[in-house]
Amino acid sequence: MASVFSRMSAMSLLLGLVACGAPIVNNTDPIQSKGVKVVTTFLPITLFTEAVAGDCADVTALIPPNLGPHDFQATPSDLTDLSGANVLVKNGLGMEEFLDDLISSADNKDLVVIDSSTGVKTIKAAGGGHHDDHHDDHHADEHHDHGHGHSHGEYDPHIWLDPVRAAQQVENIRDGLVKADPSCADGYKNNADQFTAKLNELNTEFTAKLKPYNGKTFVAFHDFATYFANRYGLKAEFLVDLPEMNPSPADLQRVAAQVKNSGLKALLTEPQEGNRSFNALAKDLGVNIVEFNPLETGSAESAKVPGTYFEVMRSNVNNLVKAIGD
């Protein structure tokens, strides 16, 4: 994958733009006009923002729904979208490592940036196929994005897969939109209340459904499920850190041993990944492949329906139960 710096340098030459390199300071002045234009980064952030915005704002995804943040390469039209936007909503925690350069090139001094991870309790990222089974006492507003190259940084960014943390993200989006566009404050608040209530119900449902499997281990293709696993008393293992990485022989041996020791009936694959090595490993071990969708990608239609989150997450839990077995 080309580096973010290389991609943005090439784009800057193409457009005749020069990135200023200065830190981005979020504008905090309220937007006075109607027709607020909100740009989101990738699928879960788009779903959460659509839920909160309702009829109050127009929401546009920066990354096409069929692409994940790892595969995104900015185009001139992306600069145009950011240049004309009032608000940008991101996941944070290094998930969108391309953003700083892109925002600088867009040169939109009035752009309000909402980091949905602010204040969310984080877990340190860990290579080598596992995480510690505890929560680190850090919150997302205590550090900056650390994404460089093929790494998300110090902290795991996949907070949206935990419904409790997802509710915090929704609240951050609500607060940011209310501050940016107070003319529709009641709408943002009511919409957010309804969505967070559903997230809380989902958490209650999952807690009951997964309680019999407390302490069980599951194996996913890439490192995305730690927050989810920690929420429900499970242990998450993974083959590779990032979806575009190729597993080493040591990775395959480690996962094979874990599958044999845990009695897993299936490995968890992802809809957007070919995972040929994962499929071959499952065949060698005599286990099945089932899908756990990390919601990094989806269809254009699903991205406009906030209920997609609940549908996919329920499917994930059903498949997870199949993978863990009795």
Model-derived segments and their meaning:
Residues 1-10:
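Bacterial N-terminal signal peptides that target proteins for export
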Residues 3, 20-326:
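Extracytoplasmic metal-acquisition and chelation regions
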